[in-house]
Amino acid sequence: LLINGGFMFLSALLSYIYKDGITGDLIISGTIVSITGLLMLFLNKNHDKQINKREGYLVVVLGWVIMIFSGTIPYLLTGTIEGFSNIFFETTSGYTATGATIINDVEILPEGILFWRSITHWLGGMGMIVFAIAILPLLGIGGMQLFSAESPGPSTDKLHPRITDTAKRLWLIYVSYTVIETIFLQFAGMSFFDAINHSMSNIASGGFSTKNASLGHWNSNPMIQYIVII
């Protein structure tokens, strides 16, 4: 929830820069989600921080469900998508990096919502559990059980002995590739806003775009398509 809330505030910043009229709604969204996350953290601070494998599976399932439901709040408060079922579908599609959408005209959406939409792709692409493994030790909570629940295969004691460091390196690579692609797309002719959104979507192997025609909007510029393919 704290991760979601932080990125909602980042979306609010983009909204303020582009003056799309929904900055306040995004700030409220981030505040609600962040306070809820802090409250849950406070209520559980005295509980046993070591979790077994069964609890690890439960945390993985509930983690995804909570992330998706909290991710619907910006859509609900801004009123950019009608109907909770449509909002839930769009949010789930984002976090699962599916790329399916119920929005007929994405170009009329405010920049803050388009950015939040791409953020859900980006977070879901690497996997929130991998991100959690990287930061849970900072809170004094073990992450190996989450890794066991999220990743089928050999037992974790046969894998990298420092799984937290591995998760951090994965995210460093993920962020680096996103930044590099954003820069390349800008050099190829995209605006910064379009470049960062398409980079997050592409790195996550998703399909969300800021244009109705997606990359077809830049058919006259094959360099953009080459960058995305590479």
Predicted segments, located by residue:
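Membrane-proximal intracellular helices of multi-pass ion channels
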Residues: 1-230
